[in-house]
Amino acid sequence: MTSISTLSNPTAQAEIAEALNQSVAETAVTTMLAQNFHWNVTGMAFGPLHDLFQTIYEDHFTGQDDLAERIKAVGGHAEGMLAGMVSRSKVTEHDGHASDREMISMMLQAQETL
């Protein structure tokens, strides 16, 4: 893949790649959060929430890939290490031990961060 020729300023390229990597990290952590909640949700609203969390993690996974490809297009290096994504992300991981209401609240907070 070649770099975008209109972005000839290396500083601008690095800043854009860094901002996109921040988005990749937050999207990746949100993706895993949604998948974790998909696996572990219980309660009266299990069915709809199980489906909702699946939709979120599938959509976010696709978005994460698009962001990483844009990083490469501006000449950057896409963060591919889970530890790097977790340390960079403003979205926090969760172990999945939460009520359905707590999961909804955490997912809304993660979406707002994105």
Regions found by a protein language model. Give the residues of each.
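Conserved alpha-helical segments that form or flank metal/cofactor-binding pockets of metalloenzymes
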Residues: 41-84
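General structural signal for secondary-structure boundaries
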Residues: 9-15, 81, 99
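Glycine-rich tight-turn/loop motif centered on a GG-T
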Residues: 10, 45-54, 93-102
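Non-membrane alpha-helical structural segments and their capping/turn regions in soluble enzymes
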Residues: 17, 50, 54-57, 61, ...
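Mobile beta-alpha loop/short-helix "lid" or hinge segments that flank ligand
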Residues: 35, 82-87
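Alpha-helical bundle segments that constitute or directly flank the non-heme di-iron/ferroxidase center
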Residues: 12-41, 103-114
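Short, charge-rich amphipathic alpha-helices with coiled-coil/heptad character
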Residues: 2-8
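Acidic/histidine-rich alpha-helical segments that form the ligand environment
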Residues: 19, 65, 69, 86-114
